Every structure is written in C-alpha cells, then in structure tokens.
Amino acid sequence: MRIGIDARELTGRPTGVGRYLASILAAWGDMPDAKAHTYLLYHPQEDQLDLPSPDSGALAIARRPVGGGRRSWWEQVRLPIALRRDRPEVLFAPAYSAPLMAGMPVVLTIHDLSFVAHPEWFGWRERTRRRWLTALSARAAGCVLTVSQFSKSEIVRLLAVPPDLVRVIPQAAVPSRIPGGGPPAAPGGITTRRREPFVLYVGSIFNRRRLRDLIRAFAIVARTRPELTLEIVGDDRSHPHEDLPAIAAAAGVGDRVNIRAYVPDETLYDLYSRAAVFAFLSQYEGFGLTPLEALAHGVPPIVLDTDVAREVYGDAASYVPMGDLDRTADALSRLLFDEAARRAILDKAPAVLGRYSWQKTARATLAAIEETARHPAGGPRG
C-alpha cells in the first residue's frame, strides 16, 4: 500500500509535531509490517525535508516536494493536486488539518484544541484559520487520532466529532533513535548522572504555559540560593506577547534566567541529563511530552494540577495549583534540595514510563492507517 504523509513538520527545525512524526517514522523502520508499504512524504518544494534517522531508511520512502507556497494554500490547493497525481491509498495528516478535497481516506491527528478552548491565546487570524480547518478536517476524516483521553473529550465536545471516530494513541517519553537520543539509561529507564543546580523548562513559549509564574516562583527560591539558574528552551509564540527577559529582570533574576529559542537534540538531552528539576506549569495541554522526557532522564517534574497532567504523569510528578507562586516555590525548593522528595517521585517513574513507547504508538498508528484505507467510510472505531 502507498501511504501519503503530510511531512511539512519535518522541515526547518522540527519541534512538537515534527518530533511526533519523526519518532513514528523511526519506529516504523524497525517494524516488518511497516516495511511492506511505500511512504510518499509531501513537503513544500522550498523547504528541505529532514528525515529523522537511519532507521527510516529501512522504509520505502519517496520524497514528494510540492511547489506553490506554504501553509493553508499549499495544504488546500497544491497538495491535493499532487495527491491526485500520485493516488496513494490513504493520507496521514499529523498536524491538526488536512486537504478538504484530498480525494482519498484521511487519518488526522489532533494533538489539542487550545485554539478552540482558549481563543484569547491566539491572534484572530490564527485562531480562525486553525478552528475552521481543524473542525472541517476532523469531520471529513476517516479516523481522528489524538494523544490523551482528555483531548478526545475536547474533540468530541468542541468539534462535535462522533466519539467512535476518535482513537487515543499516546505519545512516548523519548524519541525513538533520533540522533543524539540521550545518555544511556540505568535499569528501569532512568538515567543516572550528577545533577547541577538549575531548573529546566523545554517547550514552545505559550501564555498557557505560564512562564511568568515560573520565573517569579524561581526568583523566590533564588533569593537565598545564589548558585541557582533557570534554563528556558523554546520558541516564543506568546500572544499577547510576554517579555520574559523583562519579567526576569523585574523579579531580580535577569542574569540567572537563560532563554534559548532552540537547541539541537544533543544539547537538549545534555540539559535533561544535568538538570536538577524540570518545571512545566501549563494550564492546557493535549498530552505534555517534555515532562515525560525529563522524567526518563531522571529529572523530577513540577506541573500544574490539571486533568490531563494527572492522566499522563500519574504519581511521577509534583503538582501545584495554578497561580500559587508560594506553593510553586516550595515545590521547587523541595525537589532541588530534598533527596527523599526527589526519590519519592523518581521511584514512581518506571511504572509511568512503562505505559508509553514509540513502538506502541507507531504500531497503533499504522493499524489505524491500514484500517482506514480498507474501510474509508469510517476507519477504525474505539
């Protein structure tokens, strides 16, 4: 079978959805069933496609650069022309929307619905485009994949998609053999290395992730701990814009908060392996992958107490209430300096991490694609 894939997220600097798709392709490279198919990877002609690892070379992959722009015009006009030319049996769209005139069954992944649940976090053009295209794409798809039960409930509630059309396939903690895939793990999956006195955040910078609260809570702890620093890695996509350097300066820690928009995987995994604590104060996520990645590297995470966080991290996280700087500072201090508190979380990590693997994710995703191709009227159920 020939499987078309919208591979735009593998161009440029892959983050988020790009790492999701890269990890699935890498895992498919180890699966005999996956090697029976041919994969047509579509991307804008102007952008270089970056395949994730040598493992994906075990797959029959055909690159399909498509000219004629980017974003919605490319997706809705140029991509359908290429699909009609190549005629794959099914299209996998891993990033929220798909061509409405694809001319074939579509498997669509919707990771979260923040732009519907909280439109105030997006500019009017971006939220309108996302909401319209995602809703129409979901209703036209043969199968909708998502990453948590929480996100499934949001898709059903906010987009009016029938629940039996939506399948939950979680992500996993560490990308499958992406170059620089991290230091060796100790038994149980937790990496061992001497920790350094810094707090780490990794992820795109959105308002919902409340970096302003993290900086201010960090400042409370840092007043009496001059050795502490806060490392923030993520592209600033806040709306309305939040000036994090100014917030840090106002809190008195401007010289102790280091912000980088992007780091290569080798640097990222080095940061994970050295950090003492990971903090991710997001009030809305579909899954929330980076705290799991931190946990896999032996870093206890602090997260907001939300339904999806409880679903994903279970007992292997420290939970704090939204907006409570004192409680957040207490959690930071406890996990930075109390070894028993750190161990209480890390001892729970193997059971939580054992729920997830990119092999499981890739296998379930391929099954959904194959079944949707065979039964295009509705795809898989469950």
Task: Label every model-predicted segment.
Residues 1-382:
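Carbohydrate transferase catalytic cores enriched for Leloir-type hexosyltransferases
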